[in-house]
Curated annotation (Swiss-Prot):
It is found in: Secreted. GO terms for cellular component: extracellular region. This is Ixodegrin YY-39. A motif (Cell attachment site) lies at residues 49-51. Belongs to the ixodegrin family. Residues 1-21 form the signal peptide. Contains 3 disulfide bonds. Keywords: Disulfide bond, Hemostasis impairing toxin, Platelet aggregation inhibiting toxin, Secreted, Signal, Toxin. Expressed in salivary glands. Its main location: secreted.
């Protein structure tokens, strides 16, 4: 039981680490076009997804 719990926590930690943003300067900055997004070249103004209503800078 303990080994299964430890393995599950390690897998969850690895998945969470992969889901973190690459650049803290790019994520979740409100924008109207790509020039508003200062940061890496991959940082672009993206349309809203889901319940978001505004455009935000993102690397994805």
């Amino acid at each position: 039981m303990n080994a299964a719990l430890i393995a599950a926590l390690l897998i969850l930690g690895a998945l969470t680490l992969d889901a973190t943003a690459y650049s803290s300067t790019c994520e979740r900055i409100p924008c109207t076009n790509n020039s508003d997004c200062h940061g890496p070249d991959l940082c672009q103004c993206r349309p809203p997804r889901g319940d978001d209503f505004g455009y935000f800078c993102s690397e994805y």
